[in-house]
């Protein structure tokens, strides 16, 4: 794994409107929680289905997509991932990934040890709330996609 090439304090993603401000203590925790960075070439696997990897990622640069492989080998794209998206949280609650994640372009990822997630919730509940909000937002988008697929007509 590559060394941390940019400290969290100067992360360009923090300037995006979607990111909430954090305290200096929270920022120090995030920096300590981060193991480093890694890159994945376009077409490469970030997460492989059914294989645990013990890592969480933040997509720092590039594009990726989440997918599910069907029994006959076809793949269903679940959603696209852009810089700032958290990748791999669902693995925390399953034995291995329920979906795969593949790089569309060359990507750079910040890497976090999944086993440190509980420390985050204990030490910084506001950051834990942010992660919970992200998960709930993702669930809402999945619900909306399901309604679109199952019940909405073309005009809707």
Task: Place the predicted regions along the sequence by residue.
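Cyclic nucleotide-binding regulatory module and flanking cytosolic helices
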Residues: 1-42, 86-87, 92, 123
